[in-house]
């Protein structure tokens, strides 16, 4: 006979039953990671990065955000991008300037999610284009999100607004790299380095293919400059079963310590049809994770390039600057330009709420309609 129980009672019983098993499983994973993490360092799959004692560089960061509000059976949205231009002079930070772009419109529910993500990507590249047209472009340009798009963003229907926005985003990316090729790394070894940073907020947008450093297949996609020591790698692979059940995020967090990065890996090998395809086929896409402190979560960096483009020294120098520019704030750690840009983007929700109130008032009073009709009557 089933005895009716409340949800509170059910949760209390389940928590008591599952707590010991879950805690034991997590503790075992932590112990396994602690045992194997030093071997990843010895093999060269995890590298310690020298944090620059004196940071002297010009660094720009582009952050994007969108928000929606219900109106008349549909949605209004506002999508915005903010770029912060910073200068580090002997670790002293100064703001050189800022730029922004925004769009406000209505949107259908079915089109909402991916279409707005594509608008974010396009706006980020528009801000990057403005930065490269400045008299003195930044040394490093960070984009909060992906540098290229993968198949998860391809629209299903060809006639939808999503499809049109997808084509606009792809063309904007292609035009940026083509127009500024002479100013950008890897075409110009002394040019601006453009890097995509996959933060927690944009994990779904980035949808970036990662190489699993625990598997032989993932290890085969490492850049030549970061190839590990074969003999130690063999020992790690023989212990692979003990860490194979650990999630990718927990695994990366467990092997990375303070001021460290993973070996760089090719990101376009297991994900064909990254777009723009011609750009990806020509240059390739590489990535690595870095971690600035034990309190910070690892961040994934995406770069254009291949074996011929990057050296270990160049990757270490870039990681060192990113580590020095990453600051812990309100429970998360991202580069300083993103934090400053997000302070401006926090106002989007309040702005859209006020905009909706005004729109409802206009619709209720029919003032817009009356103004159109008055023109016809005259």
Go through the PLM ranges and name each one.
Residues 1-52, 57, 121-378:
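Long, contiguous domain-sized segments
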Residues 30-35, 108-115:
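Short, basic, glycine/proline-bearing loop/turn elements
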Residues 57-67:
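Two-metal-ion RNase H-like nuclease active-site motif
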Residues 66-107:
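Acidic, metal-ligating active-site segments
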Residues 118:
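Metallocofactor- and cofactor-centric catalytic cores in central/energy metabolism, strongly enriched
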């Amino acid at each position: 006979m089933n005895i009716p129980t409340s949800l509170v009672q059910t949760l209390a019983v389940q928590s008591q039953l599952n707590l010991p098993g879950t805690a034991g499983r997590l503790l075992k994973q932590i112990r396994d990671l602690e045992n194997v993490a030093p071997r990843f360092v010895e093999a060269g799959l995890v590298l310690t990065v020298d944090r620059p004692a004196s940071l002297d560089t010009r660094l720009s960061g582009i952050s994007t955000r969108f928000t929606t509000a219900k109106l008349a059976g549909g949605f209004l949205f506002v999508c915005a991008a903010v770029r912060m231009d910073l200068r580090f002079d002997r670790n002293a930070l100064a703001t050189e300037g800022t730029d922004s772009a925004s769009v406000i419109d209505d949107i259908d529910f079915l089109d909402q999610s991916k279409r707005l993500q594509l608008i974010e990507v396009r706006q980020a590249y528009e801000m990057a284009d403005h930065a490269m047209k400045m008299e003195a472009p930044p040394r490093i340009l960070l984009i909060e999100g992906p540098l290229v798009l993968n198949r998860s963003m391809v629209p299903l229907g060809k006639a939808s607004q999503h499809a049109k926005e997808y084509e606009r985003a792809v063309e904007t990316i292609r035009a940026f790299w083509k127009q500024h090729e002479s100013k950008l790394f890897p075409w110009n070894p002394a040019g601006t380095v453009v890097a995509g940073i996959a933060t927690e907020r944009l994990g779904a947008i980035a949808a970036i293919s990662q190489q699993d450093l625990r598997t032989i297949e993932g290890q085969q996609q490492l850049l030549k400059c970061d190839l590990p020591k074969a003999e130690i790698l063999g020992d790690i692979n023989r212990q692979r079963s003990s860490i194979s059940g650990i999630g990718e995020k927990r695994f990366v967090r467990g092997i990375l310590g303070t001021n460290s990065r993973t070996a760089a890996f090719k990101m376009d090998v297991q994900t064909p049809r990254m777009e723009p395809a011609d750009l990806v086929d020509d240059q390739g896409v590489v990535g690595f994770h870095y971690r600035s402190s034990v309190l910070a979560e690892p961040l994934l960096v995406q770069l254009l390039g291949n074996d011929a483009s990057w050296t270990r020294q160049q990757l270490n120098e870039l990681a060192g600057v990113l580590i020095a520019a990453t600051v812990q704030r309100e429970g998360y750690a991202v580069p300083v330009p993103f934090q400053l840009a997000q302070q401006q983007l926090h106002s989007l929700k309040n702005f859209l709420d006020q905009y909706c109130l005004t729109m409802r008032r206009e619709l209720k009073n029919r003032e817009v309609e009356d103004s159109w009709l008055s023109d016809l009557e005259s």
